[in-house]
Curated annotation (Swiss-Prot):
The gene is SF3B5. The keyword Nucleus applies. Belongs to the SF3B5 family. Component of the 17S U2 SnRNP complex of the spliceosome, a large ribonucleoprotein complex that removes introns from transcribed pre-mRNAs. The 17S U2 SnRNP complex (1) directly participates in early spliceosome assembly and (2) mediates recognition of the intron branch site during pre-mRNA splicing by promoting the selection of the pre-mRNA branch-site adenosine, the nucleophile for the first step of splicing. Signal peptide: none annotated. The modification N6-acetyllysine is found at K17. It comes from Homo sapiens. This is Splicing factor 3B subunit 5. GO terms for molecular function: RNA binding; splicing factor binding. GO terms for cellular component: nucleoplasm; nucleus; precatalytic spliceosome; SAGA complex; spliceosomal complex; U12-type spliceosomal complex; U2 snRNP; U2-type precatalytic spliceosome.
Length: 86
């Protein structure tokens, strides 16, 4: 019983500490937004991958970085409308 409580407590601690880990009420849209933003940050943080994208798109590295940052605003589009509760 204590082992189960400890694991649950550790999970709650991680979820409160890190934004992208989600929680019980995380929607599919929020989860996908976190994944996409994490991917875009990784692309910008790895210099060689950024060079690869710049060559593939025939753009400068600064333009590719700017485009990735623009995509981070709403990577999955606007959130879906929630059904109203009566």
């Amino acid at each position: 019983m204590t082992d189960r409580y400890t694991i649950h407590s550790q999970l709650e601690h991680l979820q409160s500490k890190y934004i992208g880990t989600g929680h019980a009420d995380t929607t599919k849209w929020e989860w996908l937004v976190n994944q996409h933003r994490d991917s875009y940050c990784s692309y910008m943080g790895h210099f060689d991958l950024l060079n690869y994208f710049a060559i593939a798109e025939n753009e400068s590295k600064a333009r590719v970085r700017f485009n990735l940052m623009e995509k981070m605003l709403q990577p999955c589009g606007p959130p879906a409308d929630k059904p109203e509760e009566n």
